[in-house]
């Protein structure tokens, strides 16, 4: 069920990050060198999850692996125990909660009309669902972390804190963000561009679907304008 995927991506996945924040508060901040293996694993895991996204042909699997890669950045940022890292991790959890839930919602909108989640079979949706294409574009731009969204602010805070802690981390961080941009654009172009393969009649998008997307993206945009509410 799509509701389960949306709640899982938006709330349950972030509870792990919240748990790590609570545990880290009980540990001494001077011992961050002890956590180097965990930070390395988190960044390497984020990069591997992003590489897995590039191999996916299933739309829902791609979005799920995308959530895993973002949580790798969150874990790395929390583990170094700096104010910037903690603020960036909290902001990214909130921003990606909205974004990944919106992506799952859009994937279901596509699935209800095409009855498939294979990327190559869902192409050309721009021709039959033009309004949904706008939502796809906005959500993918937020997933890539383009300014001035909260995703950009949070990833910038995480990159700054990790780079200040150890400049070498910029290699895995930069690679991870480059791959994120690649698979997000690939997902958008695979589903929207090209000729449509659908021969049957397709119903247009409903008002409830537009309302659902607006309830995801408008709060995220409003928080992006005033990030000090959560940072």
From Swiss-Prot:
Keyword terms of this UniProt record? Electron transport, Membrane, Mitochondrion, NAD, Respiratory chain, Translocase, Transmembrane, Transmembrane helix, Transport, Ubiquinone
> How is this protein positioned relative to the membrane?
Multi-pass membrane protein
Q: Is NAD included in the keywords of this UniProt record?
A: yes
- InterPro entries per the record? NADH_UbQ_OxRdtase, ND/Mrp_TM
Record-level Gene Ontology MF annotations: NADH dehydrogenase (ubiquinone) activity; ubiquinone binding
Entry's Gene Ontology BP terms: ATP synthesis coupled electron transport; electron transport coupled proton transport
Q: Tell me the enzyme class.
A: translocase
Bilayer-crossing regions? 1-21, 34-54, 61-80, 84-106, 118-138, 156-178
List the GO cellular component terms: mitochondrial membrane
Q: Where in the cell is it found?
A: Mitochondrion membrane
Is the Transmembrane keyword given for this protein?
yes
| Pfam families given in the database record | Proton_antipo_M
Give the EC number(s) under which this enzyme is classified.
Answer: 7.1.1.2
Reactions accelerated catalytically: a ubiquinone + NADH + 5 H(+)(in) = a ubiquinol + NAD(+) + 4 H(+)(out)
Give the family, as the similarity comment puts it: Belongs to the complex I subunit 4 family.
Summarizing the function annotation, the protein's role is:
Core subunit of the mitochondrial membrane respiratory chain NADH dehydrogenase (Complex I) that is believed to belong to the minimal assembly required for catalysis. Complex I functions in the transfer of electrons from NADH to the respiratory chain. The immediate electron acceptor for the enzyme is believed to be ubiquinone.
What is the name attached to this protein's record?
A: NADH-ubiquinone oxidoreductase chain 4
Q: What organism does the UniProt record list as the source?
A: Azemiops feae
Q: Recall the taxonomic lineage recorded for the source organism.
A: Eukaryota, Metazoa, Chordata, Craniata, Vertebrata
């Amino acid at each position: 069920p799509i509701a389960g995927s949306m709640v899982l991506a938006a709330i349950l996945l972030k509870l792990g990050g919240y748990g790590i924040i609570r545990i880290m508060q009980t540990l001494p901040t001077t011992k961050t060198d002890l956590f180097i293996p965990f930070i390395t694993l988190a960044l390497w895991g984020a990069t591997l999850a992003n590489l897995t996204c590039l191999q996916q042909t299933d739309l829902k699997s791609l979005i799920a692996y995308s959530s895993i890669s973002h949580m790798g950045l969150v874990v790395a940022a929390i583990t170094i125990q700096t104010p910037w890292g903690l603020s960036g991790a909290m902001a990214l959890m909130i921003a990606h909660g909205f974004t990944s839930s919106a992506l799952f919602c859009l994937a279901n909108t596509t699935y209800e009309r095409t009855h498939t989640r294979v990327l190559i079979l869902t192409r050309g949706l721009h021709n039959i669902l033009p309004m949904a294409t706008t939502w796809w574009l906005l959500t993918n731009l937020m997933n890539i972390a383009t300014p001035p969204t909260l995703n950009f602010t949070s990833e910038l805070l995480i990159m700054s804190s990790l780079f200040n802690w150890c400049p070498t981390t910029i290699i895995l961080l930069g690679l991870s963000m480059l791959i994120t941009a690649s698979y997000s654009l690939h997902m958008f172009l695979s589903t929207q561009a090209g000729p449509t393969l659908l021969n049957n009649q397709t119903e247009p998008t409903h008002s409830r679907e537009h309302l659902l997307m607006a309830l995801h993206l408008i709060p995220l945009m409003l928080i992006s304008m005033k990030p000090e509410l959560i940072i």
